[in-house]
């Protein structure tokens, strides 16, 4: 972000884990809310040292607290517990639209959809044709970028920022689920660039470390 002068950050859902409010029974002790809240405050404080505009969308994990309280806690209640900064903006929506300043380009829909596919870009492709715009999709923990099936819209799976080796439901028992991978997207001048772990991204080039 500092290299490219990016001052606005959108966290598109699942900032929290909230396993304590999951409908699934836990097989290992869940992280307590006090610990999540404290960690959240530290992360947001550090992000605000650089970013001037921090925007949160809701993901399925964040909504666990809403469901636990039968909707009595809204997005301001939840995220208000980690920051009161006027640089922080929260939404109860699981998506937002970023207009494309290039008159020849389509807008970008950033979404934490409720759908999952084992095949990367499948959900993003369907959403692009439903909403007629470029898609940056979350929730599935894939990292990929391409065109929709008709080659009109750019479709992206944004990856995730979580260590899957620390997720009990992923690691304890064998399963045929897709793997997860780290990643994020930079949107600048109407163009999206995806970043992932090496060799998806040459981080020596990004950080100007030539050694």
Map each language-model feature to its residues.
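Flexible, charged surface loops at secondary-structure boundaries
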Residues: 1-5, 48-50, 83-84, 102-105, ...
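Short, basic, glycine/proline-bearing loop/turn elements
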Residues: 28-29, 102-112
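Short acidic low-complexity segments
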Residues: 87-104
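Conserved beta-sheet core of the metallophosphoesterase superfamily
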Residues: 107-196, 202, 208
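A short, hydrophobic/aromatic-rich structural module that often spans a beta strand
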Residues: 60-66, 112, 205-211
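Short, solvent-exposed secondary-structure boundary motifs
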Residues: 80-91, 168-178
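Core catalytic region of metal-dependent phosphoesterases/phosphodiesterases
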Residues: 1-90
């Amino acid at each position: 972000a500092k290299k490219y002068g990016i001052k606005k950050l959108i966290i598109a859902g699942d900032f929290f884990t909230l396993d304590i409010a999951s409908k699934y029974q836990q097989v290992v002790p869940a992280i307590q809310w006090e610990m999540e809240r404290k960690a959240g405050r530290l992360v947001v404080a550090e992000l605000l040292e650089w970013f001037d505009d921090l925007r949160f969308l809701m993901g399925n994990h964040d909504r666990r607290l809403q469901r636990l309280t039968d909707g009595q806690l809204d997005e301001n209640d939840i995220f208000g517990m980690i920051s009161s900064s006027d640089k922080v903006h929260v939404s109860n929506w699981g998506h937002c639209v970023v207009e494309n300043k290039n008159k020849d380009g389509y807008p970008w829909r950033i979404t934490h959809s409720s759908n999952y596919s084992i095949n990367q870009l499948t959900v993003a492709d369907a959403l692009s044709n439903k909403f007629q715009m470029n898609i940056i999709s979350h929730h599935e923990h894939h990292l990929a970028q391409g065109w929709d099936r008709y080659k009109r819209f750019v479709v992206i799976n944004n990856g995730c920022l979580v260590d899957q080796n620390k997720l009990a439901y992923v690691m304890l028992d064998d399963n045929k689920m897709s793997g997860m991978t780290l990643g994020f997207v930079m949107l600048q001048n109407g163009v999206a660039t995806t970043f992932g772990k090496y060799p998806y991204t040459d981080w020596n080039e990004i950080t100007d470390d030539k050694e």
